[in-house]
């Protein structure tokens, strides 16, 4: 998942080091203290994996989807107006829904104070749906 502070660019290097220790010492449980966009933990091969994060948006979304995975299937790409309404009116939306909209539809994943970035026009004139891409990456 695209996420501010993402370790995606360095995931291959980080995973190689961690996986080496996990394999060498036959470690059964891996704890990711800063799961964020899940760019490391999703690549770790271990019997048990536990992801943690301090960001309540990430935690709300993870916990809710763990208990009800079909929720994300019902989400549609928000319009610009919907995005700003969700961002600016916290109390009007369920925590998991707010998290999904802000995490998946913020420009460059700048959730707090961010701006709409769910879709964009590519150089060849096509529309790229970052919201759907982020949602699908999260569901993996």
Q: At which residue positions do the language-model features occur?
A:
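SAM-dependent nucleic-acid methyltransferase catalytic core
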Residues: 1-17, 23, 65-140
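SAM cofactor-binding core of SAM-dependent methyltransferases
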Residues: 27-90
């Amino acid at each position: 998942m695209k996420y501010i502070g993402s370790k995606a660019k360095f995931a291959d290097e980080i995973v190689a080091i961690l996986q080496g220790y996990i394999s060498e010492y036959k470690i059964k449980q891996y704890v990711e203290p800063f799961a964020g966009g899940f760019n490391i933990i999703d690549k770790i091969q271990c019997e048990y994996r536990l992801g943690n994060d301090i960001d309540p948006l990430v935690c709300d979304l993870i916990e809710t989807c763990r208990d009800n995975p079909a929720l994300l299937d019902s989400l549609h790409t928000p319009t610009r107006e919907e995005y700003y309404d969700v961002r600016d009116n916290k109390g009007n939306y369920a925590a998991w829904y707010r998290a999904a909209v802000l995490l998946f539809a913020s420009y460059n994943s700048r959730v707090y104070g961010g701006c709409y970035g769910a879709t964009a026009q590519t150089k060849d004139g096509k529309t790229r749906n970052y919201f759907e891409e982020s949602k699908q990456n999260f569901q993996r």
